[in-house]
Amino acid sequence: MGTPLIGIFLSQRFGAQTIFYVGVATSCYFVSRALFQIPIGMISDKIHHDNDEILILFLGCFIMGIVYILIPFITESWQYFLLMSVEGFGTSMNLNSWRKLFASNLDKRHEGVGYGFYETIMSFATAIISLVGGYFSSLGNVAFEIVLISIGFAIIIGGLVSASILLIKDRKSKNI
């Protein structure tokens, strides 16, 4: 979630209230995420193959991508709160299913290394995206709007790539 950079982006629209709105929106995100993670986990546990996790992962990515595409069009604080709530829902779909799929495909003798690689990749990717996002936000709103929309499409494409897991016939997670 790019809350700090999005907050800077929205500061020209919301003025002095921006910091408060970022706090409310962040709360909306985490409350929504907290409310949906367990029910989504229960749904994915009821079906004993990975097709549901892959579908939930794709839908979560799609929802999260749409949120980033819509952020540049925010004109009112309630829209920001709603979008962050929707992102929380999408994130809960994404994280539950991704973690379950990832864990089921790890080499059991090298789980620590597998998780280490995953977290290293995620940390570097977040650092690079933050750096690029910060740079583009310094160029003005139009450049940052393009970045947000591009991030949205990249997340949706990531969801499509994750759906391609279904094409792998001998995947370990097939019967989880």
Where is each model-derived feature located?
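Structural signature of the two symmetry-related core transmembrane helices
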Residues: E53-I69
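Hydrophobic core of transmembrane alpha-helices in multi-pass small-molecule transporters
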Residues: W78-N94
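Helix-to-loop junctions at the C-terminal end of transmembrane segments
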Residues: I38-N51, S137
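Helix-loop boundary and gating motifs at the non-cytosolic
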Residues: M1-F30
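Central cavity-lining transmembrane alpha-helices of secondary-active solute carriers
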Residues: V24-M42
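A membrane-interface helix-boundary motif in multi-pass transporters
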Residues: Y135-I155
